[in-house]
Amino acid sequence: MDVVAGKALQVSDAVYSYQLDGKGGVTSISPDAVATAEQPCWLHLDYTHPDSAAWLQNTPLLPEVVRDGLAGESVRPKVTRLGDGTMITLRGINFNNDARPDQLVTIRVYMTDKLIVSTRHRKVYSIDDVLNDLQSGTGPTNSGNWLVEIVDGLTDHTSEFIEDLHDKIIDLEDDLLEQKIPARGQMALLRKQLIVLRRYMAPQRDVFSRLASERLPWMNDDDRRRMQEISERLGRGLEDLDSSIARTAVLSDEISSLMADAMNRRTYTMSLLAMVFLPTTFLTGLFGVNLGGIPGNTDSFGFATFCMMLVVLVLGVAWWLKHSKWL
């Protein structure tokens, strides 16, 4: 890449605009700054901001095929080499307010040894973590180190979210052991979160593996080794996701079984009640026809006698059901 001057990186509505000092810190990109491999410039943009969108479409620092990629629709994680630059798309857990974590945020990055251009729409907390390290003087020192720190933060947040989902599954299993059925939709939401995370984290692991194996000029051997370790860590998280998805399938079957048992018990109870009161209903209907000749209609104790007869009949039917082991 030709010389990258700070004057070409002045974007008024940029989220962040910094130059790494090569010692773990950052300085603002001044118009007189010159990006080097030892001190690359980092431009972090929200592609929905007007000046940022215009810069992405008009700057000569970006290849033509990269422009739409940095401001396009969300896609699955991938990495593409473009000459001396690399286009990377990654996904992360969404910790923004009023959003579910499984509604993943997207970060798109175009990198060379001298320039880092990253874009997003929704806030990515892993980037803020890296910026905090840079502002405290303990951050990455070059482009490759910057990328490793970003993917390390994304993977840490993903692992934490997977652990939270695992804890929810354990709680559901404990509740089912106590015959407690979860709230409607809770299991469906949990399975959706697991499946969505599995869908995007599997290709993201492949991206990390490729970055670790590619001989990118701006990544040294230590960066490649760390990238491979991060890929393996995410792979273990994917194994946990697979086992969690299988466990939720078992939980769904168990919940269906519990609900069916509860329905069967209610139906059985109603059937027994019908059997108990069917003879009494027949007799009360028979004696209620209001025709002449009904036994006891002239007896002052006729009603009491009839009620006692009904009680005896109910007790008799109940005894028979008990003796037949239906109760």
Curated annotation (Swiss-Prot):
It is found in: Cell inner membrane. Residues 293-300 are periplasmic. It is a multi-pass membrane protein. GO terms for cellular component: plasma membrane. It catalyses: Zn(2+)(out) + H(+)(out) = Zn(2+)(in) + H(+)(in). Coiled coil: none annotated. Keywords: Cell inner membrane, Cell membrane, Ion transport, Membrane, Transmembrane, Transmembrane helix, Transport, Zinc. InterPro entries: CorA_cytoplasmic_dom, CorA_TM1_TM2, MgTranspt_CorA/ZnTranspt_ZntB, Zn_transp_ZntB. Its main location: membrane. GO terms for molecular function: cobalt ion binding; cobalt ion transmembrane transporter activity; magnesium ion binding; magnesium ion transmembrane transporter activity; zinc ion transmembrane transporter activity. The chain crosses the membrane at residues 272-292, 301-321. The keyword Transmembrane applies. Residues 1-271, 322-327 are cytoplasmic. HAMAP family: ZntB. Zinc transporter. Acts as a Zn(2+):proton symporter, which likely mediates zinc ion uptake. Belongs to the CorA metal ion transporter (MIT) (TC 1.A.35) family. PANTHER family: CORA FAMILY METAL ION TRANSPORTER (EUROFUNG), ZINC TRANSPORT PROTEIN ZNTB. This is Zinc transport protein ZntB.
